[in-house]
Amino acid sequence: YKLEKSICKCETIEIGAVMLDEQLREISEFKRIIKPKYCTKIYPKYEKMTGITTAMTMEGEAFESAFHSFAQWCLDKGGEIQIIAWSGNDLSQLAREIYLKRVELSQEEKILMDGWRDFQKEFDHMLDKEYQISLDLALIYADVAFVGHRHDAVWDSRNTAELLRRTREEEDRTRIVHRAKSLFTTDPLAVSLEELFNFSCLVPQC
């Protein structure tokens, strides 16, 4: 238990997503609050950041149940489906917890995970950036205002979906590249906090 707890320094406390059709229109959403297995208290600053309190996680689902529900939600629509996320951090986090908590995956779930698409990496490549761009900064480059609560899984997904729509056409991508170049600065004081720190892994207090 001590070894597992030391490995799992952060646990997933929420799984959230929106589903898009072929025209990139939102047709469904998924949200589950997860009860951590090893950590029982969330730092107040993370409660404020995410809107998820310790009390909420204590009423949440086990990770295994929530993950299987998410996978089933994805697969129930039938046909081809691909998970698109802002950065590969979510995939790495899920993979670590699946391994640590010994979650058995079906063949369909394995295929679903293998098809994960890192949209942040694509966006960085589009702008020819060697560093990772935050979702907030990417939206600024696309001239899109963030809608909803930041660090809420569903709202982050919804804003990622909007960014995906804004980069669908070559003309739109070219416009974003030009805007990014006009806004880019080498002044380190102008870099956003999310460029300096990775908030994707929220550490509950153990």
Task: Give the residues covered by each predicted segment.
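Alpha-helical transmembrane segments that form the membrane-embedded catalytic/substrate-binding core
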Residues: 153-163
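Short helix-to-loop capping/linker segments positioned immediately adjacent to catalytic or ligand/cofactor-binding
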Residues: 78-85, 104-107, 146-151
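Acidic two-metal-ion nuclease catalytic site recognized across multiple nuclease folds
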Residues: 161-206
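Active-site catalytic microenvironments for nucleophilic, acid-base chemistry
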Residues: 97-101, 141, 166-170
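Active-site-proximal helix-loop-helix substrate-binding element of RNase H-like nuclease domains
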Residues: 41, 47-50, 54-57, 121-155
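Substrate-recognition/cap helix-loop segment adjacent to the acidic, metal-dependent catalytic center
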Residues: 89-114
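Conserved non-catalytic scaffold segment of RNase H-like nuclease domains
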Residues: 1-92
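A contiguous pocket-lining binding segment that forms or flanks enzyme active sites
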Residues: 113-122
